[in-house]
UniProtKB/Swiss-Prot annotation:
Organism: Mus musculus (Mouse)
Role noted for this protein: Morphine modulating peptides. Have wide-ranging physiologic effects, including the modulation of morphine-induced analgesia, elevation of arterial blood pressure, and increased somatostatin secretion from the pancreas. Neuropeptide FF potentiates and sensitizes ASIC1 and ASIC3 channels.
Keyword field contains Lyase: no
Domain of life, per lineage: Eukaryota
Protein name: Pro-FMRFamide-related neuropeptide FF
Signal sequence region: 1-21
Gene Ontology CC annotations of this record: axon terminus; dendrite; extracellular space; neuronal dense core vesicle; perikaryon; postsynapse
Residues the record lists as Phenylalanine amide modifications: F82, F111
Subcellular location: Secreted
């Protein structure tokens, strides 16, 4: 599965779940899980403002994650690095005499209507 499709599926599930929690009512202080403490947020999250937890900000973060560049598309079209004449460019002197005659006669072909 492509990472973009996975991110969109995650976003869709997140938004659907968000809608269900809004209908059922928000969690109150008496509905906290047994394993959670009721104290303030840990200091590691103190610098994060509360607006980051909105659905719009979650959507924005997912879109930014999808748009991060992984590799340049030019990476796929690199010249051959190993093999014959890998360190230099082609020249007509490197070709044998028969190939030189062939390339001198080569002309662009016309396809389609004449």
């Amino acid at each position: 599965m492509d990472s973009k499709w996975a991110a969109l599926l995650l976003l869709l599930l997140l938004l659907l779940n968000w809608g269900h929690t809004e209908e059922a009512g928000s969690w109150g202080e008496d509905q906290v899980f047994a394993g959670e403490d009721k104290g303030p947020h840990p200091p590691q999250y103190a610098h994060i403002p509360d607006r980051i937890q909105t659905p719009g900000s979650l959507f924005r973060v997912l879109l930014q994650a999808m748009d991060t560049p992984r590799r340049s598309p030019a990476f796929l079209f690199q010249p051959q690095r190993f093999g014959r004449s890998a360190w230099g460019s082609w020249s007509k002197e490197q070709l044998n005499p028969q190939a030189r005659q062939f390339w001198s006669l080569a002309a662009p072909q016309r396809f389609g209507k004449k």
